[in-house]
Amino acid sequence: MLTFLIPTAKEMMIPKESHPHLLPQDSQAILKIMAAMTTEDLAKSYRIKEEAAKKEQQRWQDMASQQNLAYPAYQLFNGLMYRHIKRDKLTTQEQAYLTQQVYITSSFYGIIPANHPIAEHRHDFHTRIKIEGQSLKSYWRPCYNQFAKEHPQVISLLSSEFDDVFSKDCKQLWISPKFMAEKEGQFKTHSTISKKARGAFLTACMENNCQTVDSLKSLVFAGFYYHPDLSTDHEFVYIKKEA
């Protein structure tokens, strides 16, 4: 069985479905630090303006006082990749695939199933804090490595910020899809192409119930197709021709 890892997103949209917010033990140490930070501290940590930091401060304080709700993560996150993932009117098989084989890597919650209930928050591995004297990446590394040991065959749709959260020896069987546009024989990639394609790729995997590495090579989605000459055992390259 294939396991997919996808990143979080800064952009969020409140869905209809909500739950009480139950925070994992490992996250509580982070919450304690974030909730104690001033608006000025948060602005520096996030590298945002103080006006925007006020909103984030309120979210953390609401979370600390247990006054907020939680929502299925794949529905709450609404960044470009998430908007290109099929999230509504799923078949029973697609729903099972999404909730049992897709996991979200978070610097606040750890690695969680795609439908795990989470609260509105802003947090990533660039957030400048120390937990028990450790960086966020060092703090989460044992948890992330344990997940990797339990799920050796991972399809990683993660961005570069996660490269050194996992130890290298845990990623020997990982495959990272790469998405490129071809125009007049020139190949290019950028974040917009990649984010849209990640969502479309995951949707195609769900719809086709891909369970083997070889099945990924036959996928055609949003104009992309597998390119064997550019691919390696650990990097599957998908090309889309542009007019």
Curated annotation (Swiss-Prot):
One Gene Ontology cellular component annotation held by this UniProt entry: cytosol
Classification via Pfam families: H2O2_YaaD
GO annotation, biological process: response to hydroperoxide
InterPro entries (UniProt xref): YaaA
Domain of life, source organism: Bacteria
Membership in a protein family: Belongs to the UPF0246 family.
Protein name: UPF0246 protein M28_Spy1772
